[in-house]
Amino acid sequence: MIILGYGDKKIENQLDAFQKKYPDKLSVNPTFDETFAHMIEAGTDFFLMPSQFEPCGMNQMYSLRYGTIPIVYKVGGLADTIQEINIDEQSGNGFVFEKYTSREMVRAIKRALKLYKKTEELHTIIVRVMKEDFSWDVSTDQYLDIYHKILI
């Protein structure tokens, strides 16, 4: 597991202790480095982004482009861009927890791990989410649709 970012000092200290105990299983990096973030997003199966406040968020979109499935708290831009995966309906692009509790976050992670065991379905979802388009062309069309509805 790779952890990038900073937050509550008490938690950082606990994570540092875990890293010392399990150096081959955990890497804790209490800073933010854009290049390293992209390396993580490109080289992992899942990307946990448990932000309590995220007005936009780009990392979840980068993760999708790299084929890494995001696990996010439903807030701000994360709520706008990530929808719960539904294998039967072939919809969604990540795993979402709606209450900011450790229990709900663990449930979302468990749903991701359940998908991880379904290799064929996971591959299909990865291919699908890598094609998602968050470009300004799409956003512009969505805004124009809204303005058109307002004016009519």
PLM feature segments, named:
Residues M1-A37:
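Nucleotide-activated donor-binding/catalytic signature segment of Leloir-type glycosyltransferases, i.e.
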Residues W136-I152:
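C-terminal alpha-helical cap of glycosyltransferases
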Residues N29-F32, T124-I126, Q142-Y143:
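Short coil/turn segments at secondary-structure boundaries
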Residues F18, A112-L115, I150:
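Hydrophobic helix-cap positions at the C-terminus of alpha-helices
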Residues F18-K21, Y62-R65, H148:
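Short, surface-exposed basic-aromatic patches at helix termini and helix-loop junctions that form
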Residues E34, M39-I126, M130-K131:
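Catalytic binding pocket for nucleotide-activated donors in carbohydrate/polymer assembly enzymes
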Residues D24, T68, F134:
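Short glycine/serine/threonine/alanine-rich loop segments
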